């Protein structure tokens, strides 16, 4: 998974592929 905020956002959206 990504680190920091990206990881948390990934969990919230039900996806571990959130990259912004």
Curated annotation (Swiss-Prot):
Originating species: Acremonium sp
Dependence of activity on temperature: Optimum temperature is 50 degrees Celsius at pH 5.0. Stable when incubated for 30 minutes at up to 50 degrees Celsius, little activity at 75 degrees Celsius or above.
Name of protein: Endo-1,6-beta-glucanase
Keyword terms, alphabetized: Cell wall biogenesis/degradation, Glycosidase, Hydrolase, Secreted
The family this protein is said to belong to: Belongs to the glycosyl hydrolase 5 (cellulase A) family.
Localization of this protein: Secreted, Extracellular space
GO cellular component, as recorded: extracellular region
Keyword Hydrolase tagged: yes
GO biological process, one term: cell wall organization
């Amino acid at each position: 998974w990504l680190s920091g905020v990206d990881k948390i956002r990934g969990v919230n959206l039900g996806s571990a592929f959130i990259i912004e």
